[in-house]
Amino acid sequence: MDAADTAADADTAADADRAADADTAAEAAALTGEQQRIRRTLRDLLAERTGPEENHAATATPEGYDPELWARLSAGLGLAGLALPAKYGGGGHGPAALALACEETGRALAPSPLLATAVLAAPLIAALGTPAQRAELLPRLVDGSLTSALAVPGGSLALALGLTGDNTAEDWSGGGRAGGIQARAVAAGDGDGSGGGGWRLYGEAAQVLDGHSADLLLVAAHTGGFARSRTLLFLVREREGGTPGLVRTRRNALDLTRPHATVELRDAEAELLGEEPADVLGALAATGRIAAVMLAAEAVGAAGAALDRAIAGLGPRARPGHRTAGALQAARSTLADLYVRVEAARSLTYCAARESGPGPESGPLALAQALEALRATAGEGVRLHGGGSTGEREARLFYQRAASDELLFGPARRLRARAAERTGLFGEVAA
């Protein structure tokens, strides 16, 4: 490699830095002062407390995350309550502020209960809970003293949230047949819970995010048999010394920063979330649309970090003997294409987050774009760094996040197919 090639590499790196600075300035101009403060403070804290080694140590704990860091994120920065109403101790900022926070935690691949607690569980409690349940649970979720997880039968989380199919059309919760999770009333009355007593749950939920460590489980279960078939949400509380009938087993995960568990309910005592009648399936779908935006923000943050590492890793490869001029030019062109994909995903995510009420398609479409951008960027990072290097091991962590999220919430093609179905792109508009 000659001096001209080396100079060209230096110019390319400088151009990339200038482009990144320009994008950062443009993003900052579009954010409010409060949102800029949230991003800056959170990024500084995560830079101090996270990294490949720190994250690995955190995932090895019984909780699967760093409890001290979570306390600072929730009680200190108010992350868990950013989008919750102020009367419960939340920030009342709406989805946009929470999406910014998710982008930063995604950039750091920080293991935390943020997704399970603040994105999936808290909105359901706020939407369906009785006044007493909201007053009891939401302030504790906000300050981080209580963590929660959403448990649905089998591996049907994406379907239950309405992301990959119509959650009203398929019997994902059990459908009155064997399997799924079944709920039965234990009080006198008509036998379906209207007698005012408690409930018992029997069944199994797999791939429950943070299900091994959450203090409170929100369990989707089927009840009513064929006569009054319906899906309800129940609260299963962790008791000191263990909850009778509740068995939680942490499973090996493709992405260690996304720990999940199998939850077995063997005639476990439960409390109905809210009151009947309630539009549980509608609340799950609404939560799914918001969750898609937050997952997209995480994926965009991770994709941006993976791209930064790939660009940085290209520098050492430019030394004489490592690559030919043609190979370096091809790598630069690929990174430029990836940069466009990441920025397109970021734009879609920001647009979805800023809508006053995300439409049925904006969140899932942003998630599909972001997952594909993350997978492509992380994959290129693995290829550029080469096998066995430190950079390759770090790039692989981002690829594992992309693959894990697609398994849990995708894949991207099904997210897009469901969006097309809902808009009637290929026929009648779906429910």
Predicted regions: what they are:
Residues 5, 17, 50-61, 315-323, ...:
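C-terminal helix-coil-helix/basic helical segment that borders enzyme active sites and/or dimer interfaces
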Residues 151, 180, 198, 202-246:
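A short core secondary-structure module
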Residues 74-144, 213:
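Internal helix-loop-helix
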Residues 2-4, 23-27, 39, 385-431:
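Glycine-rich phosphate/cofactor-binding loops in nucleotide/flavin-utilizing enzymes
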Residues 143-170, 174-175:
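A short, Trp-centered hydrophobic/proline-enriched beta-strand micro-motif
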Residues 27-33, 38, 246-343:
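Glycine-rich beta->alpha junctions and the first turn(s) of the following alpha-helix
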Residues 164, 168-169, 174-176, 207-210, ...:
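Flexible, small-/acidic-enriched active-site or ligand-binding loops
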Residues 5, 9-11, 15-17, 21-23, ...:
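Asp/Glu-rich intrinsically disordered low-complexity tracts
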